[in-house]
Structure formats: C-alpha cells, structure tokens
C-alpha cells in the first residue's frame, strides 16, 4: 500500500494542474514553507540542514524542512552536494532560484506595505526595495559566485550580501 501511495504521489508531483505559468511557479515553490527555505539559503547563507533548522524564524519542523529540501531539489531550485560519509550535505541555489531575487524583493515590499512586520525582520526587505533592480542584479551576481562558482564581481565597497547581513545584525 505504501509503495502504491508513493507512486501516486510521484505521478501527481510530475503532472501540472494546467499549462499556466503562474500555476507552474506555484507548484514549484508556492507552499507555505518553500519560499522561506529559499529565503534562508539566499539571504541567510544557510546551506546545511542544521543551519536551516536552527536559524528558522518561523520554527520549521525537521520533517517539514527535510520534505521541502527534497521538493526544492526535485524542482531544480536547489542542488544537494553529498559530502560523503560523516559529512554534512550542502545545499546551493540554482540559476532558477537566483532569478527569484526580484520576486523576493517584490514580496518583501508588499509585506512591508500591507502586513505588520518587526524592525529586525524588515530591514532586508527595505534595503532591497530601496536599491531596486540595480541592487538585485548585484545580489544575483554575488549569489552566482557563491552558489554556481561563477567569477565574483569586482568590489570596491562591501558586497550586497555583506551590507544586508550588517543591516540585519544592527537591527537585532
């Protein structure tokens, strides 16, 4: 019976409800935890299961986190690097998830305008909103260097990632 349910679940996960691009996106990351996991990898530089679990502001349960990580890898939004026996597996963003930076910025800005937030947790959204597309492009280039191994952008000032981290720490 379990094997039959697993096969049915796999089939459902592979079949889209429709050919609508918004539906396709929602099916990839539209549940209540996937965007938060991606946020923590993207903005918190949490790359390991324990870091994601311990650093979750929303207190994600370990079984939910494990499930979402598997789904995000399956959807092509994260990669999982197996480090070998006794070592931790590292998760990395893919190009597809890095291209979600503008979506995160817009979601954050919407949340700032329409939902109550706390100072500490709103600081990154404020910076992304204020910086707009030029800042997003810089951040995406930095994320590509970290997660995809592309050449790091040349710097004469702190990186976007460093500035976001400093602002977050200062607001804490």
Question: What are these regions, as identified by a protein language model?
Answer:
Residues 36, 40, 77-79, 106:
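Solvent-exposed, amphipathic alpha-helical segments
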Residues 20-61:
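N-terminal helix-turn-helix DNA-binding core of bacterial DNA-binding proteins
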Residues 6-9, 15-16, 33-38, 48-49, ...:
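Short histidine
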Residues 56-80, 86:
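Canonical helix-turn-helix DNA-binding module
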Residues 1-29:
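N-terminal leader segment of winged-helix/HTH proteins
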Residues 49, 76, 115-119:
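Short amphipathic alpha-helical interaction/hinge segments
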Residues 1-6, 104-172:
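C-terminal regulatory/oligomerization modules of transcriptional regulators
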Residues 30, 84-107:
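Basic, amphipathic "hinge/linker" alpha-helix immediately C-terminal to the N-terminal HTH DNA-binding motif
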């Amino acid at each position: 019976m379990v094997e039959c349910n697993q096969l049915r679940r796999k089939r459902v996960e592979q079949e889209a409800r429709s050919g609508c691009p918004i539906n396709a996106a929602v099916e990839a990351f539209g549940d209540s935890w996937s965007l938060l996991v991606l946020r923590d990898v993207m903005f918190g530089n949490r790359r390991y299961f324990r870091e994601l679990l311990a650093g979750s502001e929303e207190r994600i349960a370990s079984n939910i986190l494990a499930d979402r990580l598997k789904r995000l890898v399956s959807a092509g939004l994260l990669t999982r690097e197996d480090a070998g026996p006794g070592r931790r597996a590292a998760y990395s963003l893919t190009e597809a998830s890095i291209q979600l930076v503008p979506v995160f910025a817009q979601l954050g800005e919407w949340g700032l305008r329409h939902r109550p937030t706390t100072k500490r947790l709103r600081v990154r959204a404020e910076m992304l909103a204020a910086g707009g597309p030029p800042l997003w492009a810089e951040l995406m280039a930095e994320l590509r260097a970290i997660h995809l191994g592309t050449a790091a952008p040349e710097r004469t000032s702190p990186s976007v990632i460093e500035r976001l981290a400093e602002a977050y720490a200062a607001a804490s």
